[in-house]
Amino acid sequence: MKSNNILDIETENINKNSLDIDKKSTSEIIKIINNEDIKVAYAIKKELNQISNVIDLIFERFKKGGRLIYIGSGTSGRLGILDASEMYPTYGIDQNRIIGIIAGGNKAIKNPIEGAEDNEKLAIVDLNKIKLNSFDTVIGIASSGKTPYVLSALKYANKKDALSIGLCMVKNSEMTKIANQVISIKTGAEIITGSTRMKAGTATKLVCNMITTTLMIKLGKVYKNLMIDLVATNDKLKNRAFKIVKQLTSAKDQIIYKALAESNFSCKHAIVMILRKISYNESVLLLENCDNSLTKLLEEKV
């Protein structure tokens, strides 16, 4: 067994606020948990400038065709997969543009795979499977900042001239010696000692939300605060698409239904078709001339 002093890091410390949690009532337990969770957003707030810098770096590569790749083990890997999997239905982004990889493969999503997080070679194999290239960004997620699988992924990203980003929950981690940029959120000791699926996991999810949501906004996938590139794969989303078009055009229902049907339920194109009184094909050309940004088209009167 290799030792990387995992027990010396902040996320493994004893939380003095939950020392007697096993003796508390249900209401007392959840108050302790809630009080600790509140601290997560404040910890992230301290790193907003760095998160912003990282997003701008990712965006520059992404708009040139690069991909965003989350990679991690255990909870960290699962959270990356969760965030990546939401991008297609919410924003209509190609499913191969934002990818989540977990140590041990798909089986590890539900069940722990023994030794996967310590396997440095496995990270290289996994990144080779997706043909990592210099336009890509690799975000290695590890609460401790020390997971061998994740550190290996960041090293390999450097070798391939991809952008390497570390996301961890401690300061001055091993990631700072490897990654091009590191986002370090100091979440501190967990309520249950070492259970980083809790505060560390919450912080990871919030940061991933920030990264991908901001990226999608900058790519023109949002108008005002509406998801105009959603993929209407069920009745709920079709109703949402109708509501979005209605809100932005105030058109009669039959006109909206017709535009959505002709545009394969593309809110963005249906909106342009109605407001400019043009065909679907014409709306495609018009949006292409505006970098597919409805904001540019409507606000700049193109």
From Swiss-Prot:
The keyword Iron does not apply. Residues 58-221 form the SIS domain. Pathway: Amino-sugar metabolism; N-acetylmuramate degradation. Keywords: Carbohydrate metabolism, Lyase. The active site is at 86 (proton donor), 117. Specifically catalyzes the cleavage of the D-lactyl ether substituent of MurNAc 6-phosphate, producing GlcNAc 6-phosphate and D-lactate. This is N-acetylmuramic acid 6-phosphate etherase. It comes from Mycoplasma mycoides subsp. mycoides SC (strain CCUG 32753 / NCTC 10114 / PG1). The lineage of its organism: Bacteria, Bacillati, Mycoplasmatota, Mollicutes, Mycoplasmataceae. The gene is murQ.
